[in-house]
Amino acid sequence: MQRLVAVIAQQFDEHPGNYLAFFSSFAYLKSAAALLAEGRPDIPQWRQEPRMGTDARAEFLARFRPEGQGVGFAVLGGVFAEGVDLPGSLLIGAFIATLGLIPVSVTQDHFQARLDKLFGAGHGYADLVPAMQRVVQAAGRVLRTPEDRGWLWLLDDRYRRAEVVELLPAWWQLDAARQPGASPP
């Protein structure tokens, strides 16, 4: 987790602005936010909380102001990962620190087994495709208009797997070796 927080801090230092950081759970989100706050208390941050009401959601989104700076921590697949419009400088980048897979459960295992029996690719249909839909949806918070440019950090080693890469949009310019400091394409 130190590496993940270091990437967030370095990207923020090199390109100050508004960012969203997405995590697989509230526990993971809380741990990462606490680590960033401990090591870099100068970086403003705000967090999605479980069961946020309308007013709390509005307050979270109000933190994204033109020429603002900070990191909003949210859960991938949650209320801030889709249906949120933050064009231009309201949001200049996102960090996705998870592949977004559905948690293991008996129901999910049965669904995957059924799809595997029918199509021979149960894991892909039941797990990977929905996960990548959530990732693309969250990434879409950064690019809201044709003029928007920004950074998207996929901070999970599983994004290097061929079966995952082939599910990402073809127009994404992927650079597995890119480090903080680069300009957006």
Which residues fall in each region the model found?
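ASCE RecA-like P-loop NTPase motor cores
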Residues: 1-185
